[in-house]
Amino acid sequence: MGVIARQSIKGAIANYIGVAIGFYVSFFILTRYLTQEEIGLTRVMVDAAVLFSSLASLGSNASIVRFFPWFRDGGRHHGIFGWSLLLPLAGFSLFALIFLIFKAPLLEAYSVNAPLLADYFHLVPMLTFFALYVTVFETNASVLMRITVPKLVREVGIRLFNLAAYLLYGYRLISLDLFVCLFCGSYALAMLLNLFYLLKINRFDFSIFRIDRRFLTRDRVREVLRYTLFMTAAVLAGNIPLFNSLFLGAKAGLALTGVYTIASYVANVVEVPYRSLGAISRPVIAAAVKEERWDEVSRLARQVSLHQLLVSLLIFTLIWINIDALFTVIPNGADYAAGGVVVFVLGLAKVVNSSLSIATDVLNYSRLYSRSLLFIALLTAAAIGFNQLLIPRMGIGGAAAATLCAYGLYFALLLAYLHLRLRVSIFSAAQLKVLTLIALMLLLGEAWSRWLTPLLGLHVLLDAALKTLLLAALALWGVYSWRISQSVNDLLKKFVRAQ
């Protein structure tokens, strides 16, 4: 647990540095120098690449986490890293073939409302390859408990590389064509940096491709292959929000997708802690599931879920009470203010996913992992159906609502299934305390905006800062005095003693 805590903290620091950079870039660079259509273009390209790379991985990223404890023997890993490199390559080759076959109908779907995307659609396979191996190398580092540097590359490095491309294009030093190439190249650079890091810590050499047959009995090979194939579908669960921008681009055009993009950047801040803690907690959950210690699995799952709920809801609340101030200060904010509803609804969806996704990990690492296909099929069908239904009626708000509805249906059924079959539950009384505290904060935030803001007459930024500080202090007091989390209380006590 000490390693988990240290790596979690370092990963969180990397995440929040990335969030700070991403916040500045998204709200003060993109909105100033790129049109809504150009913002939508970059978003659709990245979301398409991430979705396609998730499928092309053929479940290898999840399988290395699940089966790493089986292959680990002291400092040796008996070829599992070679498996994790070769399987995605096979998956990408299959994806490239399918892309060539269906390229024409895909282009036709975007030709009316998003003609700019058609000009750069040929770069999507290349971007998919880069995104695929950024994740592959990061997963390899994760199971070795060396996640900090890959997190820095993903959360900070890519954003800085993109910032350079935005500024070069914003000052018209490069053409749009070169800008898009540099934008894609940032993922290539991130992929190479992650590879060099693994080489530096002496985890990669040609011996990784020699799989020790003593560790691959016929039954185990069958289990690994079956699990990997099932996880090819299961990875869709984490990428449901990507459907939103893809559907919006085709049905509403890149300009509205650009507005949705800026709003979703705000909502994405909610799940930053999930990315860090999730990457470190999954190997621990996998080890407990492997030994079928279900009481321990429930304890770990409750702990992870509680802290994810607490942190994600606190971040969501502090964002929402300042949403009007945010759209007031960003360049061309009036053009993007319509995205406020997206921030609220998609933010709630991020809270649901962050706090409950540990249930997906438990199912995927258990002997019942094949059942995940049914749940993923349900989630995918729900996401597509809700997008088709709600986007024509509600626009960008419909895209956000589609994600929330799909997640709500998915997790309700999944949690019931885990409780019935494995007796695993992630709920605790402390979560009710969190919800009560957040409701109180939202009420006080609304009261402040209605009565104190006009009364005080402060500058919008000063008013937002004062409101945030006071409500954050109230939240800390509530967490401590209500004893929501013993771990958080211990951290607060240590912080007070250190002062």
Model-derived features: where do they sit?
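Membrane-interface junctions at transmembrane-helix termini in multi-pass inner-membrane proteins
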Residues: 5, 130-156, 347-378, 418-420
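Interhelical loop/hinge segments that connect adjacent transmembrane helices in multipass membrane
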Residues: 1-4, 116, 172, 176-182, ...
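Helix-loop junctions and terminal segments of transmembrane helices
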Residues: 27, 57-73, 143, 263-305, ...
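Hydrophobic alpha-helical transmembrane segments
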Residues: 152-204, 264, 377-384, 388, ...
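Interfacial segments at transmembrane-helix termini and the short loops linking adjacent helices
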Residues: 36, 103-124, 320-350, 357
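Signature of the first transmembrane helix
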Residues: 3-62, 91-100, 127, 226-249, ...
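Transmembrane helical elements of multi-pass membrane transporters/channels
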Residues: 7-23, 158, 182-198, 202, ...
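Membrane-proximal transmembrane or re-entrant/amphipathic helices at the cytosolic face
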Residues: 446-499
